[in-house]
């Protein structure tokens, strides 16, 4: 019994590259058989080429181009049998042909006669876009888009498969390219509401900018009479300075020191 953790076989592509090792089938017979097996995918072109190893044993290469994308989940789906010997089964290695041009050049590189080659249909010269082409397309999208919506729309049109499986990544990129505008801060309380009103102004002058006799005695441990005198002096002093008394600019000249022995 196969392990449940074994990877599931699947080939999903319009273009298939098949290799039948040690295959003695005629290329034309293999081609006709594959046309029947792949009929539902509407084949456009099939090339079957027989190649001989150095020891003389043959193997068969086949390139198939379909109109519809083939979904092959059974590795034995394209097995071929001989009419004369139904027990002779030829099992292929099945791959997606990423570049049909290169595959066709590879399988026909050393064909020595038409007997070893069979072709049907019209070859479609297609190839998968390279990484450089995809990078250039993405760069053009980034530079030309002007909003998140336009960026995501262009990515969806150019890279539909990537867009369907990596939408969150593209949305993150869109937010990075076109961030939300910074909101202007509006204070909850306007500056005008912070101005002291008359009631608060009176309380402020009475409690914050004045010293009661009891507080002064408590802080300085001064007798009541002395504390009262100190507070009256501080009040008078503060009032005189608030009244704008100009500071004195006169200064007494120091007397010259009298040296010993000098008379009057």
From Swiss-Prot:
The keyword Hydrolase applies. GO terms for cellular component: host cell cytoplasm; host cell nucleus. Residues 10-123 form the CRESS-DNA virus Rep endonuclease domain. A divalent metal cation binds at residues 51, 59, 61, 110. The keyword Ribonucleoprotein does not apply. A motif (RCR-1) lies at residues 17-20. SUPFAM superfamilies: Origin of replication-binding domain, RBD-like. A motif (RCR-2) lies at residues 59-61. Belongs to the geminiviridae Rep protein family. There are 3 rolling circle replication (RCR) motifs. RCR-2 may be involved in metal coordination. RCR-3 is required for phosphodiester bond cleavage for initiation of RCR. This is Replication-associated protein A.
């Amino acid at each position: 019994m196969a392990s449940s953790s074994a990877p599931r076989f699947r080939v999903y592509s319009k273009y298939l590259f098949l290799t039948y090792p040690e295959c003695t089938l005629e290329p034309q017979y293999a081609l006709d058989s594959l046309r029947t097996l792949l009929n539902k995918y509407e084949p456009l072109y099939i090339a079957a080429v027989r190649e001989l190893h150095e020891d003389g044993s043959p193997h068969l290469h086949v390139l198939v181009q379909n109109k519809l994308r083939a979904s092959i989940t059974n590795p034995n789906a394209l097995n071929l049998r001989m009419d004369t010997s139904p027990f002779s089964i030829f099992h292929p290695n099945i791959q997606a042909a990423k570049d049909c041009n290169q595959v066709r050049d590879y399988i026909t590189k050393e064909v020595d006669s038409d007997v070893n080659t069979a072709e049907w249909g019209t070859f479609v010269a297609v190839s998968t876009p390279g990484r450089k082409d995809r990078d250039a397309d993405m760069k053009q999208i980034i530079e030309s888009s002007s909003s998140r919506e336009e960026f995501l729309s262009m990515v969806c049109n150019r890279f539909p498969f990537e867009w369907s499986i990596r939408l969150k990544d593209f949305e993150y990129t869109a937010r990075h390219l076109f961030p939300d505008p910074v909101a202007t801060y509006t204070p909850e309380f306007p500056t005008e509401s912070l101005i002291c009103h008359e009631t608060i102004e009176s309380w402020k002058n009475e409690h914050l900018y004045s010293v009661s006799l009891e507080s002064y005695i408590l802080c300085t441990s001064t007798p009541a009479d002395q504390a009262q005198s100190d507070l009256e002096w501080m009040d008078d002093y503060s009032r005189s300075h608030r009244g704008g008394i100009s500071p004195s600019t006169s200064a007494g000249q120091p007397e010259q020191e009298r040296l010993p022995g000098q008379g009057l």
